[in-house]
Amino acid sequence: MTDHALLLVNLGSPASTSVADVRRYLNQFLMDPYVIDLPWPVRRLLVSLILIKRPEQSAHAYASIWWDEGSPLVVLTRRLQAAMVEHWPHGPVEIAMRYGEPALPDVLERLAAQGVRKVTLAPLYPQFADSTVTTVVELAKQTIAERKLPLQTRILQPFYDHPDYIQALAASARPYLEQQYDHLLLSFHGLPERHLKKLDPSGNHDFQAADCCKDASAEMRAVCYRGQCLATAKAFAQKMGIPDGKWSVSFQSRLGRAKWIEPYTETRLDELGKAGVKKLLVMCPAFVADCIETLEEIGDRGKEQFIEAGGKELVLVPCLNDHPEWVRVLAGMCENA
Protein backbone atom coordinates (compact mmCIF):
# COMPACT_ATOMS: atom_id res chain seq x y z
CA MET A 1 0.00 0.00 0.00
CA THR A 2 1.34 3.42 -0.91
CA ASP A 3 1.18 6.53 1.23
CA HIS A 4 -1.47 8.60 -0.62
CA ALA A 5 -4.98 8.24 0.84
CA LEU A 6 -8.31 9.35 -0.57
CA LEU A 7 -10.62 10.71 2.11
CA LEU A 8 -14.29 11.13 1.20
CA VAL A 9 -16.02 13.56 3.55
CA ASN A 10 -19.75 13.97 3.96
CA LEU A 11 -21.94 15.88 6.40
CA GLY A 12 -22.70 13.22 8.98
CA SER A 13 -25.51 11.65 10.94
CA PRO A 14 -26.60 10.87 14.49
CA ALA A 15 -25.24 7.58 15.83
CA SER A 16 -28.80 6.31 16.25
CA THR A 17 -32.39 7.52 16.22
CA SER A 18 -32.46 8.04 19.99
CA VAL A 19 -33.34 11.54 21.13
CA ALA A 20 -30.06 11.76 23.06
CA ASP A 21 -27.95 10.89 20.01
CA VAL A 22 -29.91 13.25 17.79
CA ARG A 23 -29.52 16.07 20.34
CA ARG A 24 -25.76 15.47 20.50
CA TYR A 25 -25.50 15.52 16.71
CA LEU A 26 -27.63 18.63 16.27
CA ASN A 27 -25.63 20.47 18.92
CA GLN A 28 -22.35 19.73 17.14
CA PHE A 29 -23.82 20.65 13.77
CA LEU A 30 -25.60 23.86 14.76
CA MET A 31 -22.76 25.15 16.96
CA ASP A 32 -20.42 25.18 13.96
CA PRO A 33 -19.85 28.91 13.27
CA TYR A 34 -19.86 28.17 9.55
CA VAL A 35 -23.42 26.84 9.88
CA ILE A 36 -24.91 29.46 12.19
CA ASP A 37 -22.63 32.43 11.63
CA LEU A 38 -23.55 34.43 14.72
CA PRO A 39 -21.38 35.46 17.71
CA TRP A 40 -20.84 32.56 20.11
CA PRO A 41 -23.15 33.79 22.92
CA VAL A 42 -25.99 34.40 20.47
CA ARG A 43 -25.36 31.12 18.69
CA ARG A 44 -25.27 29.22 22.00
CA LEU A 45 -28.56 30.75 23.11
CA LEU A 46 -30.24 30.10 19.77
CA VAL A 47 -29.04 26.50 19.57
CA SER A 48 -30.12 25.86 23.16
CA LEU A 49 -33.61 27.05 22.26
CA ILE A 50 -33.66 24.87 19.13
CA LEU A 51 -32.58 21.85 21.18
CA ILE A 52 -35.64 22.06 23.42
CA LYS A 53 -38.00 20.50 20.87
CA ARG A 54 -36.04 19.78 17.68
CA PRO A 55 -34.22 16.59 18.84
CA GLU A 56 -37.48 14.72 19.47
CA GLN A 57 -38.94 15.89 16.16
CA SER A 58 -35.78 15.01 14.25
CA ALA A 59 -35.45 11.64 15.99
CA HIS A 60 -38.90 10.72 14.70
CA ALA A 61 -37.90 11.82 11.19
CA TYR A 62 -34.66 9.82 11.29
CA ALA A 63 -36.51 6.75 12.56
CA SER A 64 -38.85 6.91 9.58
CA ILE A 65 -35.99 6.54 7.08
CA TRP A 66 -33.38 4.58 9.12
CA TRP A 67 -32.12 1.36 7.57
CA ASP A 68 -31.28 -1.92 9.29
CA GLU A 69 -27.63 -1.16 8.42
CA GLY A 70 -27.80 2.29 10.00
CA SER A 71 -28.01 5.86 8.75
CA PRO A 72 -28.69 5.93 4.98
CA LEU A 73 -26.13 8.71 4.50
CA VAL A 74 -23.38 6.79 6.27
CA VAL A 75 -24.30 3.46 4.66
CA LEU A 76 -24.36 4.96 1.17
CA THR A 77 -21.07 6.79 1.71
CA ARG A 78 -19.48 3.51 2.81
CA ARG A 79 -20.81 1.84 -0.34
CA LEU A 80 -19.22 4.62 -2.36
CA GLN A 81 -15.97 4.07 -0.47
CA ALA A 82 -16.03 0.36 -1.29
CA ALA A 83 -16.64 1.07 -4.96
CA MET A 84 -13.83 3.64 -5.09
CA VAL A 85 -11.16 1.26 -3.80
CA GLU A 86 -10.49 -0.31 -7.20
CA HIS A 87 -10.24 3.15 -8.78
CA TRP A 88 -7.65 4.51 -6.31
CA PRO A 89 -4.34 2.60 -6.52
CA HIS A 90 -2.34 5.12 -4.49
CA GLY A 91 -3.33 4.04 -0.99
CA PRO A 92 -6.31 3.59 1.33
CA VAL A 93 -9.77 5.00 0.66
CA GLU A 94 -11.50 6.18 3.82
CA ILE A 95 -14.60 8.13 4.75
CA ALA A 96 -15.14 10.76 7.42
CA MET A 97 -18.02 12.88 8.59
CA ARG A 98 -17.89 16.53 9.55
CA TYR A 99 -20.34 15.84 12.37
CA GLY A 100 -20.76 12.52 14.13
CA GLU A 101 -18.76 9.39 13.35
CA PRO A 102 -16.33 8.56 11.86
CA ALA A 103 -15.04 11.96 12.93
CA LEU A 104 -12.76 13.77 10.49
CA PRO A 105 -9.97 14.55 13.03
CA ASP A 106 -9.83 10.93 14.20
CA VAL A 107 -9.65 9.57 10.66
CA LEU A 108 -6.81 11.95 9.77
CA GLU A 109 -4.89 10.89 12.87
CA ARG A 110 -5.41 7.21 12.08
CA LEU A 111 -4.20 7.67 8.51
CA ALA A 112 -1.05 9.41 9.72
CA ALA A 113 -0.42 6.58 12.19
CA GLN A 114 -0.71 4.08 9.32
CA GLY A 115 2.10 5.81 7.44
CA VAL A 116 0.01 7.87 5.05
CA ARG A 117 1.74 11.12 4.14
CA LYS A 118 -0.54 12.56 1.43
CA VAL A 119 -4.31 12.93 1.57
CA THR A 120 -6.65 13.93 -1.22
CA LEU A 121 -9.53 15.43 0.72
CA ALA A 122 -12.81 15.16 -1.17
CA PRO A 123 -15.68 17.14 0.36
CA LEU A 124 -18.70 15.50 -1.27
CA TYR A 125 -20.46 18.76 -2.12
CA PRO A 126 -20.88 19.76 -5.78
CA GLN A 127 -21.56 23.43 -4.95
CA PHE A 128 -19.49 25.69 -2.70
CA ALA A 129 -20.71 26.96 0.65
CA ASP A 130 -18.86 27.93 3.80
CA SER A 131 -21.25 25.70 5.75
CA THR A 132 -20.18 22.63 3.77
CA VAL A 133 -16.86 22.92 1.97
CA THR A 134 -15.07 25.55 4.07
CA THR A 135 -15.88 23.96 7.41
CA VAL A 136 -14.47 20.61 6.23
CA VAL A 137 -11.28 22.12 4.82
CA GLU A 138 -10.66 24.34 7.85
CA LEU A 139 -11.23 21.50 10.32
CA ALA A 140 -8.78 19.32 8.40
CA LYS A 141 -6.15 22.08 8.40
CA GLN A 142 -6.72 22.78 12.10
CA THR A 143 -6.44 19.10 13.01
CA ILE A 144 -3.22 18.60 11.04
CA ALA A 145 -1.66 21.70 12.63
CA GLU A 146 -2.77 21.11 16.22
CA ARG A 147 -1.96 17.40 16.26
CA LYS A 148 1.23 17.92 14.26
CA LEU A 149 0.28 15.27 11.72
CA PRO A 150 2.83 14.71 8.92
CA LEU A 151 0.18 15.01 6.22
CA GLN A 152 0.14 16.95 2.97
CA THR A 153 -3.31 17.62 1.55
CA ARG A 154 -4.84 18.49 -1.75
CA ILE A 155 -8.49 19.43 -1.99
CA LEU A 156 -11.15 18.41 -4.48
CA GLN A 157 -12.76 21.70 -5.50
CA PRO A 158 -16.53 22.11 -6.06
CA PHE A 159 -17.55 20.47 -9.32
CA TYR A 160 -21.02 21.92 -9.86
CA ASP A 161 -20.59 22.41 -13.63
CA HIS A 162 -17.94 19.80 -14.40
CA PRO A 163 -19.09 18.06 -17.60
CA ASP A 164 -18.36 14.63 -16.15
CA TYR A 165 -20.41 15.39 -13.03
CA ILE A 166 -23.33 16.51 -15.20
CA GLN A 167 -22.89 13.30 -17.19
CA ALA A 168 -23.07 11.26 -13.98
CA LEU A 169 -26.25 13.08 -12.94
CA ALA A 170 -27.72 12.34 -16.36
CA ALA A 171 -26.79 8.67 -16.22
CA SER A 172 -28.30 8.17 -12.79
CA ALA A 173 -31.51 10.11 -13.52
CA ARG A 174 -32.15 8.94 -17.08
CA PRO A 175 -34.36 5.92 -16.19
CA TYR A 176 -36.73 8.27 -14.36
CA LEU A 177 -36.72 11.00 -17.00
CA GLU A 178 -37.48 8.51 -19.75
CA GLN A 179 -40.86 7.89 -18.14
CA GLN A 180 -43.84 10.19 -18.56
CA TYR A 181 -43.86 13.13 -16.14
CA ASP A 182 -45.24 16.65 -16.04
CA HIS A 183 -42.48 18.62 -14.34
CA LEU A 184 -38.98 18.21 -12.88
CA LEU A 185 -38.15 20.13 -9.72
CA LEU A 186 -34.46 20.43 -8.86
CA SER A 187 -34.46 21.04 -5.12
CA PHE A 188 -31.16 22.22 -3.64
CA HIS A 189 -30.36 22.70 0.03
CA GLY A 190 -31.04 26.29 1.01
CA LEU A 191 -28.82 28.84 2.71
CA PRO A 192 -29.50 32.09 4.57
CA GLU A 193 -29.08 35.05 2.23
CA ARG A 194 -26.56 36.55 4.64
CA HIS A 195 -24.17 33.65 3.94
CA LEU A 196 -23.97 34.82 0.33
CA LYS A 197 -24.00 38.53 1.08
CA LYS A 198 -20.91 38.34 3.27
CA LEU A 199 -18.95 36.75 0.40
CA ASP A 200 -19.97 39.46 -2.09
CA PRO A 201 -17.75 42.54 -1.64
CA SER A 202 -19.90 44.54 -4.08
CA GLY A 203 -22.95 44.37 -1.83
CA ASN A 204 -25.11 44.13 -4.96
CA HIS A 205 -26.09 40.47 -4.90
CA ASP A 206 -29.33 39.94 -6.81
CA PHE A 207 -31.11 37.02 -5.21
CA GLN A 208 -33.90 37.09 -7.79
CA ALA A 209 -31.77 37.01 -10.95
CA ALA A 210 -32.33 33.94 -13.09
CA ASP A 211 -28.67 34.05 -14.14
CA CYS A 212 -27.22 34.78 -10.71
CA CYS A 213 -23.51 35.69 -10.92
CA LYS A 214 -23.29 34.65 -14.58
CA ASP A 215 -21.39 37.83 -15.44
CA ALA A 216 -19.62 38.22 -12.10
CA SER A 217 -15.89 37.87 -11.59
CA ALA A 218 -14.35 34.41 -11.43
CA GLU A 219 -13.72 34.97 -7.73
CA MET A 220 -17.40 35.69 -7.08
CA ARG A 221 -18.63 32.79 -9.20
CA ALA A 222 -16.37 30.49 -7.19
CA VAL A 223 -18.23 31.28 -3.96
CA CYS A 224 -21.80 32.02 -5.11
CA TYR A 225 -23.81 29.02 -3.98
CA ARG A 226 -27.04 30.15 -5.62
CA GLY A 227 -25.33 30.82 -8.93
CA GLN A 228 -23.65 27.41 -8.83
CA CYS A 229 -26.96 25.66 -8.11
CA LEU A 230 -28.59 27.42 -11.05
CA ALA A 231 -25.62 26.50 -13.25
CA THR A 232 -25.92 22.83 -12.25
CA ALA A 233 -29.65 22.82 -12.99
CA LYS A 234 -29.27 24.54 -16.36
CA ALA A 235 -26.42 22.27 -17.47
CA PHE A 236 -28.40 19.19 -16.46
CA ALA A 237 -31.58 20.33 -18.23
CA GLN A 238 -29.60 21.06 -21.39
CA LYS A 239 -27.82 17.70 -21.18
CA MET A 240 -31.15 15.89 -20.91
CA GLY A 241 -32.94 18.06 -23.46
CA ILE A 242 -35.63 19.17 -21.00
CA PRO A 243 -37.49 22.18 -22.42
CA ASP A 244 -37.87 25.42 -20.49
CA GLY A 245 -41.07 25.40 -18.51
CA LYS A 246 -40.85 21.70 -17.73
CA TRP A 247 -38.23 22.15 -15.02
CA SER A 248 -37.58 24.60 -12.20
CA VAL A 249 -35.28 25.17 -9.22
CA SER A 250 -36.08 25.52 -5.53
CA PHE A 251 -34.29 25.53 -2.17
CA GLN A 252 -35.23 23.35 0.79
CA SER A 253 -34.47 22.77 4.48
CA ARG A 254 -34.98 26.30 5.74
CA LEU A 255 -34.25 26.65 9.47
CA GLY A 256 -35.35 29.60 11.59
CA ARG A 257 -36.88 32.92 10.61
CA ALA A 258 -34.01 34.48 8.67
CA LYS A 259 -34.44 35.15 4.96
CA TRP A 260 -33.10 32.23 2.91
CA ILE A 261 -32.54 32.03 -0.82
CA GLU A 262 -35.73 31.47 -2.77
CA PRO A 263 -37.94 30.03 -4.08
CA TYR A 264 -38.57 27.68 -1.18
CA THR A 265 -39.25 24.06 -2.10
CA GLU A 266 -42.35 23.87 0.07
CA THR A 267 -43.76 26.88 -1.80
CA ARG A 268 -43.01 25.33 -5.19
CA LEU A 269 -44.64 22.05 -4.20
CA ASP A 270 -47.85 23.91 -3.43
CA GLU A 271 -47.65 25.98 -6.60
CA LEU A 272 -47.02 22.99 -8.84
CA GLY A 273 -49.81 20.94 -7.30
CA LYS A 274 -52.28 23.80 -7.66
CA ALA A 275 -51.12 24.49 -11.23
CA GLY A 276 -52.27 21.07 -12.41
CA VAL A 277 -48.99 19.15 -12.31
CA LYS A 278 -49.95 15.55 -11.63
CA LYS A 279 -46.67 13.63 -11.83
CA LEU A 280 -43.71 15.51 -10.37
CA LEU A 281 -40.12 14.32 -10.41
CA VAL A 282 -37.82 15.78 -7.76
CA MET A 283 -34.02 15.67 -7.86
CA CYS A 284 -31.75 16.97 -5.10
CA PRO A 285 -28.40 17.70 -6.80
CA ALA A 286 -26.80 19.37 -3.78
CA PHE A 287 -26.59 15.91 -2.19
CA VAL A 288 -24.52 13.07 -3.63
CA ALA A 289 -25.99 10.53 -1.21
CA ASP A 290 -29.56 10.10 -0.07
CA CYS A 291 -30.17 11.32 3.45
CA ILE A 292 -32.87 12.70 5.71
CA GLU A 293 -33.23 15.80 3.52
CA THR A 294 -34.05 13.71 0.47
CA LEU A 295 -35.73 10.60 1.85
CA GLU A 296 -37.85 12.18 4.58
CA GLU A 297 -38.13 15.88 3.74
CA ILE A 298 -38.89 15.31 0.04
CA GLY A 299 -39.79 11.64 -0.27
CA ASP A 300 -42.24 11.63 2.65
CA ARG A 301 -43.30 15.12 3.74
CA GLY A 302 -42.83 16.71 0.33
CA LYS A 303 -44.86 13.99 -1.35
CA GLU A 304 -47.68 14.43 1.15
CA GLN A 305 -47.67 18.20 0.67
CA PHE A 306 -47.70 17.95 -3.13
CA ILE A 307 -50.63 15.54 -3.12
CA GLU A 308 -52.56 17.73 -0.69
CA ALA A 309 -52.03 20.64 -3.10
CA GLY A 310 -53.64 18.70 -5.95
CA GLY A 311 -50.85 16.56 -7.37
CA LYS A 312 -51.14 12.81 -7.80
CA GLU A 313 -47.60 11.44 -7.72
CA LEU A 314 -44.22 12.69 -6.54
CA VAL A 315 -41.24 10.57 -7.56
CA LEU A 316 -37.97 11.19 -5.74
CA VAL A 317 -35.06 10.56 -8.10
CA PRO A 318 -32.27 8.90 -6.08
CA CYS A 319 -29.04 10.77 -5.51
CA LEU A 320 -25.82 9.61 -7.18
CA ASN A 321 -25.06 7.29 -4.24
CA ASP A 322 -22.75 4.55 -5.60
CA HIS A 323 -23.90 4.66 -9.23
CA PRO A 324 -21.09 3.24 -11.42
CA GLU A 325 -20.86 6.38 -13.57
CA TRP A 326 -20.55 8.55 -10.46
CA VAL A 327 -17.83 6.28 -9.08
CA ARG A 328 -15.89 6.62 -12.33
CA VAL A 329 -16.35 10.39 -12.47
CA LEU A 330 -15.46 10.98 -8.84
CA ALA A 331 -12.31 8.89 -9.19
CA GLY A 332 -11.24 10.94 -12.18
CA MET A 333 -11.88 14.25 -10.46
CA CYS A 334 -9.99 13.14 -7.34
CA GLU A 335 -7.08 11.95 -9.48
CA ASN A 336 -6.82 15.43 -10.96
CA ALA A 337 -7.50 17.40 -7.78
Swiss-Prot record:
Broad EC category: lyase
Domain of life: Bacteria
Catalytic activity: heme b + 2 H(+) = protoporphyrin IX + Fe(2+)
Compartments where located: Cytoplasm
Metabolic or biological pathway, per its Swiss-Prot or TrEMBL entry: Porphyrin-containing compound metabolism; protoheme biosynthesis; protoheme from protoporphyrin-IX: step 1/1
EC number per UniProt: 4.98.1.1
Gene Ontology cellular component terms for the protein in this record: cytoplasm
InterPro entries assigned to the protein according to its UniProt record, in alphabetical order: Ferrochelatase, Ferrochelatase_C, Ferrochelatase_N
Record's keyword terms, sorted: Cytoplasm, Heme biosynthesis, Iron, Lyase, Metal-binding, Porphyrin biosynthesis
Gene3D superfamilies for the chain: 3.40.50.1400
Record-level GO BP terms: heme biosynthetic process
Binding site for Fe cation: 189, 293
Described function: Catalyzes the ferrous insertion into protoporphyrin IX.
Family: Belongs to the ferrochelatase family.
Record-given protein name: Ferrochelatase
Organism: Pseudomonas entomophila (strain L48)
